[in-house]
Amino acid sequence: MSSIYMNILLAFTMALLGLLMYRSHLMSSLLCLEGMMLSLFILSTVTMLNTSFTLSSMMPVMLMVFAACEAAVGLALLVTVSNTYGLDYVQNLNLLQC
């Protein structure tokens, strides 16, 4: 495995560990998710360029569309929770507490 792939996989792993360790605040969880999506985008782009497979050229674009949708929904949820509760804790998202 080349060093480029190792660095990208290391970035994905660090973002995943950050998501698992710092999951008390919604904003830190969203940042870790964005880091994971960015590393997946770079990995798919590098893989597409190395294989020269023309049908896979839409995969990075579709991944960025899903990442933008995820960011928009996450930020809308963050604004709603912070306006309702005044905090951005993930534990406030539990619907069973209502």
From Swiss-Prot:
Entry membrane topology: Multi-pass membrane protein
Chief location of this protein within or outside the cell: mitochondrion
Record's subcellular location: Mitochondrion inner membrane
One Pfam family from the record: Oxidored_q2
BP GO terms, sorted: ATP synthesis coupled electron transport
Disulfide bonds: none
Gene3D superfamilies per UniProt: 1.10.287.3510
EC number: 7.1.1.2
Record's keyword annotation contains NAD: yes
Protein origin, superkingdom: Eukaryota
Enzyme class, UniProt record, top EC level: translocase
GO CC annotations on file: mitochondrial inner membrane; respiratory chain complex I
The protein's role, per its UniProt record: Core subunit of the mitochondrial membrane respiratory chain NADH dehydrogenase (Complex I) which catalyzes electron transfer from NADH through the respiratory chain, using ubiquinone as an electron acceptor. Part of the enzyme membrane arm which is embedded in the lipid bilayer and involved in proton translocation.
Family designation: Belongs to the complex I subunit 4L family.
PANTHER family (alphabetical): NADH-UBIQUINONE OXIDOREDUCTASE CHAIN 4L (PTHR11434:SF0), NADH-UBIQUINONE OXIDOREDUCTASE SUBUNIT ND4L (PTHR11434)
Protein name: NADH-ubiquinone oxidoreductase chain 4L
Organism: Tamandua tetradactyla (Southern anteater)
Organism taxonomic ancestry: Eukaryota, Metazoa, Chordata, Craniata, Vertebrata
